[in-house]
């Protein structure tokens, strides 16, 4: 595993879970965290520890977004009508980087963020280079014409390890995706259990 790949799996190692369900994740081979003390048996987590871990998993899945940005997203979810945890999932899944990743235009969420930053993506026909850009139902995301033959894109489309969720309609021949609806927690194909209700409890302390 290259140094770059290893860095991407740091979150997996820290949490002790393969949060993206990737075959090369180091936690597929061991059940302890990174570092010289990683093999020590972990004690039972406190309620706070359980809530913190749930937050770290959700933050980590979306590319380890900053605490400031994650809390801002939570606060927006809390202001909206309905279940705050479900609102949080909907907001996270409507991020441009999440949709580019879910559409299988790139292999990882980290690659999605870089891909967007480098200007390879259009939304409704206009280039957008902000990874946290919030999509609305019906928005069309497309790999820019000059970027469609990039190796990273051609390889990602063929990945068998994950499927495109049904709230994103994708044409892989044209490399176009439509964000068709806001998903609920049960719609989202997480590789591990995500518990947004515990994230709500964490911020409600």
Swiss-Prot record:
It comes from the Bacteria. InterPro entries: Ribosomal_uS4 (IPR022801), Ribosomal_uS4_bac-type (IPR005709), Ribosomal_uS4_CS (IPR018079), Ribosomal_uS4_N (IPR001912), S4_RNA-bd (IPR002942), S4_RNA-bd_sf (IPR036986). The keyword Repressor does not apply. SUPFAM superfamilies: Alpha-L RNA-binding motif (SSF55174). Transmembrane segments: none annotated. Residues 19-45 are annotated as: Disordered. Gene3D superfamilies: Ribosomal Protein S4 Delta 41, Chain A, domain 1, RNA-binding S4 domain. One of its GO terms (molecular function) is rRNA binding. SMART domains: Ribosomal_S4, S4. One of its GO terms (biological process) is ribosomal small subunit biogenesis. Keywords: Ribonucleoprotein, Ribosomal protein, RNA-binding, rRNA-binding. Residues 94-157 form the S4 RNA-binding domain. GO terms for cellular component: small ribosomal subunit. HAMAP family: Ribosomal_uS4_B (MF_01306_B). Part of the 30S ribosomal subunit. Contacts protein S5. The interaction surface between S4 and S5 is involved in control of translational fidelity. One of the primary rRNA binding proteins, it binds directly to 16S rRNA where it nucleates assembly of the body of the 30S subunit. With S5 and S12 plays an important role in translational accuracy. Belongs to the universal ribosomal protein uS4 family. This is Small ribosomal subunit protein uS4. It comes from Brucella anthropi (strain ATCC 49188 / DSM 6882 / CCUG 24695 / JCM 21032 / LMG 3331 / NBRC 15819 / NCTC 12168 / Alc 37) (Ochrobactrum anthropi).
């Amino acid at each position: 595993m290259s140094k770059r790949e290893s860095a991407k799996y740091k979150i997996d190692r820290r949490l002790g879970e393969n949060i993206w369900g990737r075959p090369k994740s180091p936690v597929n081979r061991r059940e302890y965290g990174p570092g010289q003390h990683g093999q020590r048996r972990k004690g039972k987590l406190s309620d706070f520890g359980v809530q913190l871990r749930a937050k770290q998993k959700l933050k980590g899945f979306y590319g380890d977004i900053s605490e400031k940005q994650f809390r801002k997203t939570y606060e927006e979810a809390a202001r909206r009508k309905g279940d705050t945890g479900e609102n949080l999932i909907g907001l996270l899944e409507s991020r441009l980087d999440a949709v580019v990743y879910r559409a299988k235009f790139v292999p990882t969420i980290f690659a999605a963020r870089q891909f967007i930053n480098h200007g390879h993506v259009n939304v409704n026909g206009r280039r957008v280079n902000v990874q946290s850009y919030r999509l609305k139902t019906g928005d069309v995301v497309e790999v820019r014409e000059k970027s469609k033959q990039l190796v990273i894109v051609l390889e990602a489309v063929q990945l068998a390890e994950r499927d495109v969720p049904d709230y994103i309609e994708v044409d892989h021949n044209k490399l176009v995706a439509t964000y068709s609806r806001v998903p609920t927690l049960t719609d989202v194909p997480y590789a591990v259990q995500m518990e947004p209700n515990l994230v709500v409890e964490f911020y409600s302390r």
